[in-house]
């Protein structure tokens, strides 16, 4: 920062927020309510007029603040922060009919489960073109269009596929046995892994295939630990700080599932495909969620942090030669019950409609 500016304007912080303070005039130039501020540049259009510019980020927006150094009046220019918010205009392949139908289904799903915000995305599985990406939120009881948040949900949805990939890399068969015990695994004094049925005594001894198809967290943990760096995989798969969105979920799932576009070994592809397809067949925990008249590969997930619940679906179809990849994410305030069944009917409406298109 220029010495003159540095002597006069300082960036102050309070409770994790930032603002600009004028030491010369003992004046708070801005409120201390921004997420990030940094000095940008100094501009002197004429001898008697000087401006100091700062870059800032606040919520979903970013911009520049220009301060008139004579009287501290401000000029601001702001826009959606491209790191946090996507734009439909960036995707010339958007299909207006698919987008409209996707919005309808997302709106109905949010109404059915009291969603506060949600996203839906449809990808062309053969070209990876984005055909639809939309977002809605509930504002005072009305469902309205919302910004396309790039950080909406956890990567935890992918856990069964990460586990299947780890088994292939470690040359461990899906038919090998894994002991999930009584549904609770104590790693240390502060970390416990619980299966969803731990109150009923857990799954006990399973094959890895059964463990992954039943989404046993203990089984998936042991699958990842078959690799020397398995704990890193576990932290990545369960890390709440590594967030994604409906468009990325659909795109990445299509990438790892589509044989022609993945530069990994046949064993790794085979494991991922097997788990993704068998999730919706007899023996898979989601077999009752399968759509009619189309073979689906994918997964549902419900994440609950005690405050909010995130319902997520990602998948592609038809499984033998995918035409579309779809993802839907809906968030709501924590309450019980919470099950994938609460969104699967609406997801299947979209899948079955697309399959006939």
Predicted regions and their residues:
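Residue-level preference for non-acidic, small/hydrophobic
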Residues: 102, 109, 120, 128, ...
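Extracytoplasmic/periplasmic proteins that interact with beta-lactams or build/remodel peptidoglycan
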Residues: 66, 70-119, 310-313, 319-320, ...
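A penicillin-recognizing enzyme superfamily signal
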Residues: 210, 232-356
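Short pre-catalytic segments that frame enzyme active sites
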Residues: 90-158, 165, 169-171, 188-191
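Residue-level detector of conserved, function-critical positions
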Residues: 1-89
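Short glycine/serine- and small hydrophobic-enriched flexible loop segments
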Residues: 107-108, 164-171, 222-225, 251-258, ...
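Conserved catalytic neighborhood of penicillin-recognizing serine enzymes
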Residues: 147, 172-229
């Amino acid at each position: 920062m220029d010495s003159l500016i540095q002597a006069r304007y300082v960036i102050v912080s309070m409770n994790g927020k930032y603002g600009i303070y004028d030491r010369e005039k003992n004046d708070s130039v801005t409120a201390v309510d921004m997420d990030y501020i940094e000095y940008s540049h100094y501009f002197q259009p004429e001898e008697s007029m000087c401006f100091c510019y700062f870059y800032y980020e606040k919520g979903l927006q970013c911009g520049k603040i220009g301060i008139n150094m004579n009287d501290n009046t401000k000029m601001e220019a702001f826009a959606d922060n491209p790191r946090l918010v996507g734009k439909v205009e960036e995707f010339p392949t958007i299909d207006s009919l698919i987008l409209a139908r996707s919005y309808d289904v997302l709106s109905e799903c949010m109404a059915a489960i009291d969603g506060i915000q949600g996203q839906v995305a449809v990808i062309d599985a053969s070209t990876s073109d984005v055909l639809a990406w939309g977002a809605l939120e509930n504002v005072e009881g009305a469902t309205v269009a919302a910004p396309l948040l790039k950080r909406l949900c956890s990567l935890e949805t992918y856990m069964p596929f990460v586990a299947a990939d780890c088994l292939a890399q470690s040359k461990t068969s899906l038919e090998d046995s894994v002991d999930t015990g009584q549904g609770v695994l104590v790693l240390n004094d502060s970390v416990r892994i619980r299966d969803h049925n731990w109150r009923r005594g857990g799954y006990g001894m399973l094959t890895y295939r059964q463990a992954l198809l039943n989404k046993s967290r203990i089984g998936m943990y042991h699958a990842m630990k078959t690799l020397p760096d398995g704990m890193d995989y576990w932290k990545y798969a369960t890390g709440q700080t590594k967030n994604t969105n409906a468009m990325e979920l659909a795109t990445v799932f299509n990438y790892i599932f589509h044989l022609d576009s993945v530069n990994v070994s046949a064993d790794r592809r085979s494991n991922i495909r097997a788990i993704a397809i068998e999730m919706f067949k007899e023996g898979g925990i989601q077999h009752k969620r399968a759509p009619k008249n189309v073979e689906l590969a994918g997964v549902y997930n419900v994440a609950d942090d005690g405050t909010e619940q995130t319902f997520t679906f990602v998948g592609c179809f038809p499984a033998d030669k995918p035409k579309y990849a779809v993802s839907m994410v809906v968030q709501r305030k924590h309450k019980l019950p919470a099950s994938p069944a609460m969104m699967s009917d609406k997801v299947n409406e979209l899948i079955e409609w697309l399959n006939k298109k």
